Amino acid sequence: SAKDIKPNAVKIGMLHSKNVIQAIIKSLDKIKTKKIVLDPVMVAKGGTKLVNNTSIIYMKNKLIKKVLLLTPNIPEAEILTKTKIFSIKDMIKAGKILISLGVKNVLIKGGHLESKQINDILLNKKTIKIFRSKKYYSKNTHGTGCSLSSAIATNLSCGKDLFKSCDLGIKYVNEAIKSNINFGEGNGPINHLNSFTINKRFKQ
């Protein structure tokens, strides 16, 4: 438990209800680490809303101010800012709105934009950084957002600064998409073990 092994960083994923958010806030107030990453999961890949409006409002008013980094994708950023995003300029505008709401740092993920490359934008009150990477087309992309926020939190826990943690996290997820493995039919997960080398004698 967190009482026994103190966390160096915390990653928070989908929060379905106001009660869950209240419990999370209470827990965060008890721990010392400020390296908290929130992935505000709100919309399924098909566009279905996963969180009710009461929870979204409570998250905006109470939780997002407590985290070091918020990592919305474009549909989530649109919900949080009540704007439409069609370009990098729109992403920056949405990021500035989130900063004005009390967010310390926001990484808006640009994978939903129609382009040959992905532009992920990291903003705070002082700086704007754009991470540009090649877009890999694959049906196996389940878990990209969750994996990215987890990778960033992991790098933060290892002592990396925020910029480096985001950079390494983005590169990790890109490689996991690029090297994906097919599991059965339909959309599968990214390859989280892409950096591992498997000894030939264990391969069938």
Role assignments for model-derived ranges:
Residues 1-45, 49, 196-198:
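Conserved N-terminal subdomain of the carbohydrate kinase-like
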Residues 84-90, 157-167:
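Short, charged, surface-exposed loops that flank catalytic or proteolytic processing sites
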Residues 79, 138-162:
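Short, small-residue alpha-helix embedded
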Residues 128-142:
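Short pre-catalytic strand/loop immediately N-terminal to key active-site residues, enriched for Gly-Thr
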Residues 163-204:
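Charged C-terminal helix
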Residues 53-127:
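Conserved phosphate/ATP/ADP-binding segment of small-molecule kinases
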Residues 16, 42-44, 76, 112, ...:
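Active-site-proximal loop/turn and secondary-structure-junction residues that shape catalytic pockets
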